[in-house]
Design a protein with these regions (language model features):
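Flavin-dependent oxidoreductase catalytic cores
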Residues: 1-68, 72, 77-83, 87-88, ...
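Rossmann-like dinucleotide/flavin-binding elements
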Residues: 62-90, 130-144, 152-163, 174-210
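Glycine-rich "HGGG/HGxG" loop immediately N-terminal to the catalytic nucleophile
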Residues: 99-100, 181
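N-terminal Rossmann-like dinucleotide/flavin-binding domain of flavoprotein oxidoreductases
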Residues: 101-143
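N-terminal Rossmann-like NAD(P) cofactor-binding module of classical short-chain dehydrogenase/reductase
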Residues: 149
Length: 210
């Protein structure tokens, strides 16, 4: 109920696919030990209900909004804006949505449930998600949005340590690219056998749970 206070109503109305899932991160519990108000990693409104504020923009005029990045932040921003009546479109440069949460899902499956919920919600709100779409200046100008929300996530660059350029050394960004198959240069650092294993893993979904 902390993650989604509407859970009982969604169950009774047959909308289980729109229930925001608890990912069991225990942020809510940890707040007690530091004497802080209750909060939730997947429900930013928890503890702030009394504010009763409209988030981001009002709907006095429907706006055309572009969200760059289909990770959890971008998808949640799109969901809130669409709920307020705006026309929202998401562009994602990769062929899959979810951002780095896809990596987190490999180790902890409940993380993937959050992405599935967001995807279900956006489908219900008729938000378009364009994959394999790089947000260039030319494309953005052609789209003519009223607002652009940049939710492309962080970069994971290696510190200036001697040897980081060696073929057996990968920084966080390169490892992410290997998992998603999006970093051609990182893949070139692998041996033929390693590249084969990577392809087999992706083909059999061993490296993709979202």
């Amino acid at each position: 109920l902390l993650a989604d206070p509407g859970l009982p109503n969604k169950i009774s109305s047959g909308q289980e696919h729109l229930i925001r899932p608890c990912i069991y991160c225990y942020v809510c519990v940890s707040q007690i030990f530091i004497n802080k108000p209750m909060m939730c990693a997947v429900n930013s409104q928890l503890g702030n209900e009394f504010r009763n504020e409209k988030i981001i923009f009002s709907t006095a005029r429907q706006k055309n909004i572009l969200v760059v990045g289909a990770g959890p932040s971008g998808m949640e921003a799109a969901r809130l804006l669409a709920m307020q009546g705006h026309h929202v479109e998401i562009w994602e440069k990769d062929k899959d949505i979810g951002g780095t949460v896809r990596v987190a899902t490999l180790a902890y499956e409940p993380n993937g449930q959050l992405i599935q919920y967001l995807q279900n919600s956006l489908k219900e709100l008729k938000v378009t998600i364009k994959k394999n779409t790089l947000a260039t200046i030319e494309k953005i100008e052609s789209f003519q949005p009223d607002h652009v929300i940049v939710a492309v996530g962080a970069t994971r660059d290696a510190p200036p340590i001697a040897g980081k350029e060696l073929n057996h050394v990968f920084d966080g960004e390169q490892l992410r690219g290997l998992l998603f198959g999006s970093d051609v240069e990182a893949i070139k650092k692998l041996s033929i056998f390693q590249q084969l294993i990577l392809k087999i893993g992706r083909a059999s979904q061993l490296l993709r749970n979202v």
